[in-house]
Amino acid sequence: MNRVLISIFFFFFLSFGFAQKGKLISKKVIDMTDTPVWNRVSENNILKPDYIHLEKLDFFSITYQSDSLVIKGILVEPKKEGVYPVVIFNRGGNRDFAPLNLSTIINYTSKLAEQGYVIIGSNYRENDEFGGKELNDVLNLTETVKEIEKGDPNCIGMFGWSRGGIMTYLSLKNSDKIKTAIVGNGVTDLFQLIEDRPKMETAVMAECIPDYWRNKEMELKKRSVIYWPEKLSKQSSLLIISGKNDKRANQNTTTKLVEKLSELKYDYEYQEFITDHFFSNKRNELDQLVLSWFNKRLKYAD
């Protein structure tokens, strides 16, 4: 009898855990006028011309379930009623460095959202493994979207910047739910990264990746798309954007990835700009390119 009860309990425990994957726990409106961003986007308490499009958007801080954890994130919705394609935005940085905040989401995705997209992004779990278990925090957003009335859970794209490129490539390796993706100045080869920036190994990799020194080669390869481009979802497509003057992510490895994708006949495009890691002097071009790609490959795709 006890064995039967234990089996029943275990069944319901697993069922509950599966059902709760990505569950939206909270959704709270962000009043932009009460945030530090307001001083940058406004003048005399009125939105500047370059940011007038923000009037058409609602911003929310969210929490959702991923594995047994509660994860923080940000959600952007058009104010206008409707059901819109969803783009998951993957932030760069690690741990508390360069977290996903209102400023970042505005800089990279607000022009896209204003044109009829729901944007959702994760701040990843506190125990950041730099491409490890926190991948679930990204993938589980495909379930969270099912609880967002304005989001179409059957029409999901992804946009990753810098370290967010690692998360995007890993997502395309582990899921067929992403119809198309964009990676901007993404990291493709962590071996090259630590050669170019040795402090990234001691201050980030060794601290974030479990058993790093013992399993270094295996763990870096697991996070480096250059070693497994053939495993990217064939159901998806990819736009890779590169800044030639990027000092943070080696763009030579990006061109090597592009060559491999070409050999594999993967559905991709590659665009290169003379700019830095943040596209500082090419923001308008970046916004237009991102919108054009998602319109063509997500919103109006056959």
Locate the predicted segments by residue.
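N-terminal cap/lid segment of alpha/beta-hydrolase-fold proteins
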Residues: 35-81
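Short substrate-entry loop that stabilizes the transition state in hydrolases
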Residues: 82-84, 89-130
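C-terminal catalytic histidine-bearing segment of alpha/beta-hydrolase fold enzymes
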Residues: 91, 248, 255-302
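Mobile cap/lid helix-loop segments that gate and shape the active-site cleft of serine hydrolases
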Residues: 99-100, 192-231
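Catalytic nucleophile-loop/oxyanion-hole region of alpha/beta-hydrolase
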Residues: 108, 121-152, 281
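Primarily recognizes the serine-hydrolase "nucleophile elbow" in alpha/beta-hydrolase
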Residues: 140-197
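Short, proline-enriched alpha-helix->beta-strand connector loops that line the catalytic pocket
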Residues: 231-238, 264-266
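Short beta-strand/loop motif that positions the catalytic acidic residue
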Residues: 239-242, 246
